[in-house]
């Protein structure tokens, strides 16, 4: 505020100019132009649809709920702005108790998604890809980048698990008391002490890769999995596996799912096709037609008891059919339409209630970051790095020019005195 209320030197200092071709630009002009540019950029950002302050379904990932088997959807993450919602679990004892795994840890809701609080922040670090409740709801488990964790009445604490179990693709509760199964990067682990410790399940060859896992209701040791791109069944807790004849290198299976209403029914997907078996994989038959985008990778399947209404989540969003898969419609009302959907979760007490999670960041990218230990530098591309360096150079030049200007002002003031 030089020259105001008698503050500053008696005579104005010599103005500082930057040569720009044949023109000279003073600091006041630079400041004015800088303010004009900043205002223009602010206006542009304000007008961009992706920068809306409200929770627009197209702007964020998140959690969504349907109470009518996917016909209508509403947000179940009030007050949250999630980058990557990866998995959700519903407490079988209390349907209003939800756990959501995100790229930053776990969130919990005790009122059906109307409010959320973080859990286990002192121990659970990084992306959480797997969550499970025990059948009685007394215990909860999660697998994060930082380890496998068990929650009981005393809170979250670390479980004992081999390093190869992290990160984990899936956590499922077995029908037997205190039984949990965990699918790590490619191997199967089991706990028989209520999730306090996990050990590898022998039987799978070292060259095989398991990529999906589900427990079949009604049997303590009955599991279904995707192994080497094929749908497999085990009736002894994963020690031995039977090839069901669906899938393979030419048509790799995306996922496999149990049915909420029929214990002997399992679902699978490959190449945009949805198939079902009513006898645990002894026979398969296709459901209707392929999805509109055959290249879509299916992440979850939910169906009515008569298999006429189907809901499918995929990396291309959510699809629904009301005629047994003869026609498919993408669900766009209140749901994101351009980001990936994760696995579906059904309310154990109401088969018509479904939860879906969406991630603004591709799941493959979140998984890669977890596998690599969260090295953020590995995710910086050349253009981003060049932009950052350019900004640093610009700031350095500005600092040098400001220092020169201040030096000249001081010299002028000193000479006048």
Identify the meaning behind each predicted range:
Residues 3, 17, 25, 33-417:
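Extracellular glycan-interacting surfaces
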Residues 4-16, 29:
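Positively charged N-terminal leader segments that act as targeting/secretion signals
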């Amino acid at each position: 505020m030089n020259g105001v209320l008698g503050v500053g030197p008696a005579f104005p200092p010599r103005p500082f100019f930057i040569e720009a071709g044949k023109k000279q630009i003073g600091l006041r002009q630079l400041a004015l132009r800088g303010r004009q540019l900043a205002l223009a950029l602010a206006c542009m950002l304000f007008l961009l649809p992706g920068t809306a302050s409200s929770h627009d379904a197209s702007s964020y990932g998140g959690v969504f709920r349907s109470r009518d088997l996917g016909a209508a959807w509403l947000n179940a993450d009030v007050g949250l702005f999630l980058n990557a919602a990866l998995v959700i679990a519903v407490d079988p004892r209390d349907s209003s108790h939800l756990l959501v795994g995100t790229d930053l840890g776990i969130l919990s809701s005790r009122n059906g998604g109307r409010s959320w609080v973080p859990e286990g922040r002192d121990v659970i670090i990084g992306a959480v890809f797997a969550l499970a409740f025990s059948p009685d709801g007394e215990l909860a488990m999660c697998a994060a980048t930082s380890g496998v964790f068990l929650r009981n009445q005393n809170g979250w604490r670390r479980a004992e698990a081999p390093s190869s179990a992290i990160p984990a693709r899936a956590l499922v509760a077995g029908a037997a008391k205190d039984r949990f199964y965990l699918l790590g990067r490619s191997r199967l682990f089991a706990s028989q002490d209520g999730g306090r410790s996990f050990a590898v399940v022998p039987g799978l060859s070292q060259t095989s890769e398991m990529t999906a896992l589900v427990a079949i209701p009604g049997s303590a040791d009955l599991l279904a999995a995707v192994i080497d791109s094929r749908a497999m069944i085990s009736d002894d807790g994963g020690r031995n596996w039977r090839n069901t004849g669906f899938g393979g290198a030419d048509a790799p299976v995306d996922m496999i799912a149990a049915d909420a209403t029929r214990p002997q029914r399992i679902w699978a997907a490959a190449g945009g096709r949805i198939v079902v078996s009513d006898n645990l994989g002894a026979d398969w038959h296709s459901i209707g037609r392929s999805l509109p985008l055959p290249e879509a990778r299916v992440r979850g399947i939910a169906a009515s008891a008569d298999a006429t209404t189907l809901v499918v989540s995929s990396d291309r969003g959510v699809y629904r059919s009301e005629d047994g898969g003869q026609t498919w419609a993408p669900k766009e009302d209140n749901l994101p339409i351009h980001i990936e959907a994760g696995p579906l979760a059904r309310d154990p007490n109401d088969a018509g209630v479904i939860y879906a999670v969406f991630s603004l960041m591709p799941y493959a990218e979140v998984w890669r970051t977890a596998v690599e230990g969260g090295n953020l530098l590995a995710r910086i591309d050349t253009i981003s790095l060049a932009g950052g360096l350019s900004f640093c150079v610009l700031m350095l030049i500005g600092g040098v020019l400001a220092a020169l200007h201040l030096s000249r002002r001081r010299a002028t003031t000193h000479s006048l005195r």
